[in-house]
């Protein structure tokens, strides 16, 4: 992702 935490990265 960009800043926030994403399930992928």
Swiss-Prot record:
Disulfide bonds: 1-6
Intracellular or extracellular location(s): Secreted
UniProt KW Phosphoprotein keyword: no
Tissue: Expressed by the venom duct.
Domain of life of the source: Eukaryota
KW Metal-binding (keyword) present: yes
Record-level Gene Ontology MF annotations: metal ion binding; toxin activity
GO CC terms in record: extracellular region
Chain positions with 4-carboxyglutamate modification: 8
Residues the record lists as Glycine amide modifications: 9
UniProt keywords, alphabetically: Amidation, Calcium, Disulfide bond, G-protein coupled receptor impairing toxin, Gamma-carboxyglutamic acid, Metal-binding, Secreted, Toxin
Similarity-based family: Belongs to the vasopressin/oxytocin family.
Known function: Targets vasopressin-oxytocin related receptors. Binds calcium.
Domain notes: The cysteine framework is C-C.
Protein's name according to its UniProt entry: Gamma-conopressin vil
Source organism of this protein record: Conus villepinii
Source species taxonomy: Eukaryota, Metazoa, Spiralia, Lophotrochozoa, Mollusca
